[in-house]
């Protein structure tokens, strides 16, 4: 009958989803173990968290009205427009902030300053677009716009990271300004991934 056919379809879809999650978790575990010195249990825990980000980001980064092909290699890549790339960026920022605290720095005392170099200005400009992006994405019910924004923000941060001496900055006031920029970037990225329904691990 129609009801049993409907339940059968639901069951099949659920099984496909469970298999998809399992396959993605296995792929993430393999990639994490290949590139990092991490205990098996910790690698499994991190892989499970990152796999959810890979699936959710991969799905939500596409417009709801458009079909897409699931590509496990692309979705689980640590490079490009993917969930793992976003999470890796967040973990990188957290690592720098933890080192700053270990050196005696106080994250609550840092203040934003006028941007210095070009990559710093680029990052500040991306951060300044957050409120407008959230308003637009909310009005249009368009999570793909949140994904596009955090991808651009992650790119801007990583460019800034490679161009700028942060913890090695000798001018203490400027160092605090750079750290404040990192705090704001972390907070906005974490706010956005929370909206998208996933979280970042403490390390990757």
Region spans (language model):
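Non-catalytic interaction-recognition regions
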Residues: 5, 9-204
């Amino acid at each position: 009958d129609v009801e049993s056919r409907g339940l059968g379809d639901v069951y099949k879809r659920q099984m496909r989803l469970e298999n998809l999650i399992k396959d993605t978790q296995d792929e993430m575990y393999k990639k994490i173990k290949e590139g990092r010195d991490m205990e098996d249990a910790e690698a499994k825990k991190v892989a499970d968290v990152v796999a959810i980000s890979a699936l959710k980001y991969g799905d939500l980064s596409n417009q709801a009205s458009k079909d897409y092909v699931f590509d496990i290699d692309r979705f689980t890549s640590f490079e490009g427009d993917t969930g793992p790339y976003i999470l890796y960026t967040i973990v990188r920022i957290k690592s720098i902030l933890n080192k700053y605290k270990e050196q005696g720095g106080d994250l609550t005392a840092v203040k934003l300053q006028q941007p210095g170099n070009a990559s710093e200005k680029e990052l500040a400009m991306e951060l300044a677009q957050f409120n407008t992006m959230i308003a637009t994405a909310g009005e249009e019910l368009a999570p793909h716009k949140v994904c596009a924004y955090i991808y651009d923000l992650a790119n801007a941060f990583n460019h800034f990271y490679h161009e700028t001496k942060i913890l090695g900055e000798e001018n203490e006031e400027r160092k605090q300004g750079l750290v404040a920029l990192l705090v704001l970037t972390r907070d906005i990225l974490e706010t956005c991934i929370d909206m998208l329904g996933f979280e970042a691990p403490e390390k990757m």
